Amino acid sequence: MSIIDNRKAHFDYHIEERYEAGLVLEGWEVKALRAGRGQIKEGYVVVKNAEIFLIGTHISPLPEASTHIKPDPVRTRKLLLHREEIKKLIGKVEQRGYTLVPLNFHYKGGRVKCDIALAKGKKLHDKRETEKKRDWEREKARIMRAGT
């Protein structure tokens, strides 16, 4: 079951490969995610020193968060992958046009995981085509309902 989805990613990118990565989170972040207080629409993934980081995701702290720490809602979070997967991703990202985008946060075995995707950006005409297909599918469903 997914906690947060990045629906914008499927509209803006051609998804080629998916990977499941662990997240290094603080306690207040896990509690906030359980309450559904996160947003990954503006998030992106970068590679630094052979490590992978998630940048730009926003996890709003709960009002009951501890008073002795000052939570940073948009801090950089480290993603945990196997070394071979990281090497493969670095090789692909260095190719022209590939990028890494977060798709969703979900639970697996009580831990929060992040699905990331190796993706290529869509051009404007591709986005328009996707929108036309979606509109046509909606119209087809409407016609089928009206016909029965």
UniProtKB/Swiss-Prot annotation:
One Gene Ontology biological process: trans-translation
Residue ranges annotated as compositionally biased, kind Basic and acidic residues, are: 129-142
A molecular function annotated in GO for this UniProt entry is: RNA binding
Which region ranges are annotated with the description Disordered? 129-148
Cellular compartments annotated: Cytoplasm
Q: Which GO terms describe its cellular component?
A: cytosol
- State the protein's name: SsrA-binding protein
Q: Which domain of life is it from?
A: Bacteria
Protein task: Required for rescue of stalled ribosomes mediated by trans-translation. Binds to transfer-messenger RNA (tmRNA), required for stable association of tmRNA with ribosomes. tmRNA and SmpB together mimic tRNA shape, replacing the anticodon stem-loop with SmpB. tmRNA is encoded by the ssrA gene; the 2 termini fold to resemble tRNA(Ala) and it encodes a 'tag peptide', a short internal open reading frame. During trans-translation Ala-aminoacylated tmRNA acts like a tRNA, entering the A-site of stalled ribosomes, displacing the stalled mRNA.
Q: Which family does it belong to?
A: Belongs to the SmpB family.
